[in-house]
Amino acid sequence: MNTSTFATPLRAMFAQRHDAAPAVVRPYDVSLILLALSLMAIGLVIVTSASMPVASRLFDNPFHFAIRHGIYIVLAIGAALTVMQIPMQWWRTSNAWLLLLGLVLLIAVLLVGRSVNGSTRWLAIGPITIQAAEPAKLFFFCYLAGYLVRRYEEVTENIKGFAKPLVVFFAFAVLLLLQPDLGTVVVMLCTTIGLLFLAGAKLWQFFGLAFTGGAAVTFLIMFEEYRMKRITSFLDPWADPFGSGYQLTQSLMAYGRGDVFGQGLGNSLQKLEYLPEAHTDFIMAILAEELGFAGVLTVLALMLCIVLKAMKMGSKALQNERPFDAYLAYSIGIWFSFQTAVNVGASAGILPTKGLTFPLLSYGGSSLIIMAAAVGLLVRIDFEMRVEGIQAIDRSGKAKASTSSSRKNKPKTASSAGKKKVSTVLDDVAYAVVDDVQDEEQDIDSIMDDFAQDESAQTVSHQTKRASKSTSKTPRGKDEEQEDGYV
C-alpha cells in the first residue's frame, strides 16, 4: 500500500473544501517521523564513535558495530513502514494472539535461549538473534489496551476487573525474572500502572498497586546479591571505584569531561575501553563527553517531543471515540519516557543500573526494531484519525452542496403559487381596511346628526325661556295687587 495512494485524495479533498488550505496535505505526521529519524542518525554517529576501540580489538574492524547498527536501522525503518500499512483494526482484533506469541517467545528463551554475561535473554533464529523481551513488551501493551476497551466498566467499578490484567503481567514478570531481566519488569510495571490510572482506575487501587509493585521490586533486589551490589555502588560508587562502582565512576568522569559543549566527536577518552558497554547501555555518557550538556539536552528534547506527541495522540483518539488507539498511544508514550529516564538516570548516577537501552539511540537490533515499530504504530494512529477527519469534512461538504442544489432546483410553479397567495392576502387586507374606513365614516355622520339635533333642541328651549320672562314683566291689575295685599 503506497503512501501516494492516500496522499492524492487527501490533497484533492482539502483543495476542494478549503480555498486557503496549503497546497500539500501530508497524510502522515512528518514531524514525528523526522524526530525518530533524527534520533537514529545521532545514534549511528555516537555508536560508531563509541564502538571503534572495542570493535578493533574484537573483530579487527573499527566499523564492525557501526555497520551492524546501520543494518539494524534499515531493518527498523522497514519494520516501521510495514506497521504503518497495517490497519489499527487488525491490532484490535489480534491483541490476544500477540499476547500468546509474547508468552511463547519468553518461554522459548528459557528453553533454547543463548546466555550472555550470565543472562539468558537472546533467542537465535538462524543468523538472527532476538531479545524476546522487546517484542513481548509491545505485545503486552497491545493486549492491555484491548482489555481496557473490552472491560472498561469492570476495571473502573470493581477490583476483579482491575486485577485481571495484573495476573497476565505477573506471568510475564515471572518469565522475565527467570532470565533474569528486572529492568524490563520495572518498565512494564510502571507502564501498566500509568495506563490503568489513565483508564480511570480508582485511586486506592492505583496507590495499592504502586505500593505492592515497589515492595516486590525491593524484595527482588534484596533477594539477589548482584542487585544489592548495584544498589550499594549506586549510593556510593567511589567507595569501590575499581570494583562494584567501576562502571558508574567511569560514566561520571565522562559526564564531567563533557562540560557544556563537549570534547568533540571522536575525542572521548572513556570509550577507550575504560567504560564497559559504552555503545549500548552507557551511550549517553559517551555522548555527554563528546557533545557536552548541549548534546544531551538536544537528544532529551527530541525524545520529549516524541513522548508529548504520543500523549497528544492518545487524548485526540479518546475525543474521536477510538479508545484502543488512545490507550496504545498512551502506553508507548509512558514506555519511551520511563525507559529514557532509567537509562539516563543510571548512566548519570541518579538511578541504579538496569541494563536498559536508550530508545532509538543505543546499539541493539531488537530494541531498535521494536522501538521503530512502536513509532510506526503512532504514525498509523495519527494517519487514521486524519483520514477520518477529512472524510467527515467531505461528508459535510457534500451535505451542504446537496442542500444548496435542492434550494436552487425548486420548481417555478411553487414560487408563482406563493406569489399569488401573497397577493390574495394583500387584497383581503386592503378590502378589510376599506370596510373599516367606511364604517368609521358612517359612525361619524350619525354622531354629527345627533349633535345637530341636540343643538336645535337647545335653541328652541332658550327661545321658550325668553318668552316666559317677557310675559312675567307686564303690570298686574289693581284687583290682583289688592288681592296680594289682602293675602
From Swiss-Prot:
It is a multi-pass membrane protein. Its main location: membrane. HAMAP family: PGT_FtsW_proteobact. GO terms for cellular component: cell division site; plasma membrane. Belongs to the SEDS family. FtsW subfamily. Residues 444-453 have a biased composition (Acidic residues). It is found in: Cell inner membrane. It catalyses: [GlcNAc-(1->4)-Mur2Ac(oyl-L-Ala-gamma-D-Glu-L-Lys-D-Ala-D-Ala)](n)-di-trans,octa-cis-undecaprenyl diphosphate + beta-D-GlcNAc-(1->4)-Mur2Ac(oyl-L-Ala-gamma-D-Glu-L-Lys-D-Ala-D-Ala)-di-trans,octa-cis-undecaprenyl diphosphate = [GlcNAc-(1->4)-Mur2Ac(oyl-L-Ala-gamma-D-Glu-L-Lys-D-Ala-D-Ala)](n+1)-di-trans,octa-cis-undecaprenyl diphosphate + di-trans,octa-cis-undecaprenyl diphosphate + H(+). The chain crosses the membrane at residues 30-50, 71-91, 93-113, 122-142, 167-187, 203-223, 282-302, 332-352, 358-378. GO terms for biological process: cell wall organization; FtsZ-dependent cytokinesis; peptidoglycan biosynthetic process; regulation of cell shape. The gene is ftsW. GO terms for molecular function: lipid-linked peptidoglycan transporter activity; peptidoglycan glycosyltransferase activity. This is Probable peptidoglycan glycosyltransferase FtsW. Pathway: Cell wall biogenesis; peptidoglycan biosynthesis. Its EC number is 2.4.99.28. It comes from Pseudoalteromonas atlantica (strain T6c / ATCC BAA-1087). Keywords: Cell cycle, Cell division, Cell inner membrane, Cell membrane, Cell shape, Cell wall biogenesis/degradation, Glycosyltransferase, Membrane, Peptidoglycan synthesis, Transferase, Transmembrane, Transmembrane helix.
